[in-house]
């Protein structure tokens, strides 16, 4: 890989037999000493000269084999993932290189379909899209979330239609919503498109589980910014993530399970003595969802 070989040349050099023999020997460490590191030669030779290798040494050698073959397989996996990914124009800043590499399990953004037309999704677009989808996943359908700089600046649920939710979410902060990323967890129809294509509106990305053809045509040919709009279809919007989340830190990775608990799935407990007005229950749940997804004050 470092030498710049072609795809076929690199595939040809993937070792199958070597790791298999090492793993087979390591599995039988109780009877076999397997050496994959030249630094272990002297200790193995010393014990052999004394009559035979100890069980403790053989176990240490086996552990090193499984770690080494695991690293080898991981390196191959990362290389394959790189081939399946997409380079982005740049990262958070113009001087940073960036790319998007979907998981092998085709879910969420990794299974999203960017519909024909529109500009390429940028690194920041992907971040905002992830934030919008994560928030709308915590809301009952139909709901809409408007995100700017990874933070929700508008969100609403409706008992009527996705268009109604969209209108209410936009009205939360129309100024911040200008140039935002919007996610809806219901079908995006022509009514939604006509609202979004109205005066004093502009969005970078629209995401929904499904779109009417008439809605797409209206957006592409209506507002001036429609030809550049990224329209993203994510069929499993509304699903729980149920995945490990990792964050790169200097010298390692922090890993935790995804926070899939939504305020709309939990029982509300009143901490004070004043009972909650039932008419405000959805407002309280919505506020809790937004607090969960806000990254600044």
Set out the residue ranges of the language-model regions.
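ATP-dependent carboxylate/acyl-activation modules
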Residues: 68-297
């Amino acid at each position: 890989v470092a030498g710049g070989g072609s795809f076929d040349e690199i595939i040809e050099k993937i070792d199958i037999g070597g790791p298999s023999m090492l793993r087979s020997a390591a599995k039988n460490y109780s009877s076999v000493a397997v050496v994959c590191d030249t630094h272990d030669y002297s200790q193995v030779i010393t014990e052999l000269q004394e009559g035979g290798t100890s069980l403790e040494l053989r176990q240490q050698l086996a552990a090193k084999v499984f770690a080494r073959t695991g690293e080898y397989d991981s390196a191959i996996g990362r290389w394959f993932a790189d081939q399946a990914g997409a380079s982005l124009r740049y990262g958070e800043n113009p001087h940073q290189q960036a790319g998007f590499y979907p998981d092998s399990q085709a879910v969420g953004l990794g299974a999203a379909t960017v519909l024909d037309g529109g500009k390429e999704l940028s690194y920041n677009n992907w971040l905002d899209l992830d934030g919008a989808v994560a928030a709308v996943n915590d809301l009952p359908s139909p709901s809409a979330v408007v995100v700017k700089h990874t933070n929700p600046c508008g969100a609403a649920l409706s008992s009527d239609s996705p268009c109604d939710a969209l209108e209410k979410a936009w009205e939360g902060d129309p100024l911040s919503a200008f140039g935002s990323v919007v996610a809806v967890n219901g079908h995006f129809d022509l009514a939604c498109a006509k609202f979004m294509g109205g005066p004093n509106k502009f969005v970078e990305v629209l995401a929904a589980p499904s779109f009417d053809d008439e809605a797409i045509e209206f957006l592409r040919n209506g507002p001036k910014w429609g030809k550049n709009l990224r329209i993203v279809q994510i069929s499993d919007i509304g699903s729980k993530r149920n995945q490990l989340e990792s964050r790169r830190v200097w010298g390692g990775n922090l890993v935790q399970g995804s926070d899939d608990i939504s305020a709309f799935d939990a029982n509300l407990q009143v901490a004070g003595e004043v009972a909650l007005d039932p008419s405000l229950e959805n407002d309280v749940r919505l506020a809790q969802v937004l607090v969960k997804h806000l990254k600044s004050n």
